[in-house]
Amino acid sequence: MMRPVSSNNVAFCASGKSSCLSQDPMRGVDQFGLYPTQQSKFSHTVTHKNISCQTQEAINETHLQTSTSRDLDTKSDLKKKKNVGRSGKRGRPSGTTKSAGYRTSTGRPLGTTKAAGFKTSPGRPLGTTKAAGYKVSPGRPPGKKQQALMCSSDA
């Protein structure tokens, strides 16, 4: 800040200059050649935009409405995304082959009919029949039990 300090009737500024511009007898403020249009360029008035409480509440309400609708969308998306990796409720994951041995949607092994009623593996590779000669679950070849009964009846 520059304040005129008078000593011995000579005007001094606090900054140490011999005179202030406002008290300079050589040039007045009007002599600097600033026209009214130029003065408006250099003298800016700062105005602050006041946001009323009503507009802030309206902004908050619209934000709440959009967030709740987003929440509903994400909940429905989560339900859709939950079963993305599977072909059905109990089916095999998508991208796997039938030979991988996944059960069908009814719970029975692939390659079996519904009438067979399998709930576990039949004891032979899936897709094969009993006539192929594979051992069944108890560990004997198919048809062996019938031959044993015939032999015992002959004796």
Curated annotation (Swiss-Prot):
Chain intervals for the UniProt region annotation (Disordered): 60-155
Basic residues: bias regions: 78-92
Organism the protein comes from: Xenopus laevis
Family label: Belongs to the UPF0461 family.
InterPro entries: DUF5568 (IPR040419)
Protein name: UPF0461 protein C5orf24 homolog
Biased composition (Polar residues): 60-69, 94-107
Source organism phylogeny: Eukaryota, Metazoa, Chordata, Craniata, Vertebrata
